[in-house]
Amino acid sequence: MISVAMATFNGEPYIQEQLDSIYNQTRKVDEIIIVDDCSTDSTVRVIEQYILSHKDIDIKLYKNEENLGYKKNFKKAISLCHGDYV
């Protein structure tokens, strides 16, 4: 099983392209775990729309209650993955 961990924070301009890149890989991933670190832009809305339009892949979105910073947020995302390969 292959998992992708994403740590997001105010990534609205790039998140759609990042998700498309993961989705269009030759070897499909089994899950995408996204942890948003209290974005103040529309990052979460874009991700939620992506999840609704891509039901053939397991995408889970988690939203932090407080900003953890990049390292802790990415560590959290990795810890939520179920794959043998991350």
Where in the sequence are the language-model features?
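Cell-envelope/extracellular polymer assembly enzymes that use nucleotide-activated donors
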Residues: 1-3, 21, 31
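Short hydrophobic beta-strand elements that form part
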Residues: 3-6, 33-34, 63
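Short, well-formed alpha-helical segments that are part of the catalytic scaffolds
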Residues: 11-24
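Acidic helix N-cap motif at the loop->helix transition within catalytic regions
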Residues: 16, 41-50, 72
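Short helix-capping segments at alpha-helix termini
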Residues: 26-28, 52-58
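A conserved acidic beta->alpha catalytic loop
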Residues: 36-45, 66
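Glycine-rich, basic loop-to-helix element that forms the pyrophosphate-binding segment
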Residues: 64-81
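Short aromatic/hydrophobic "clamp" motif used to bind/position activated sugar donors
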Residues: 86
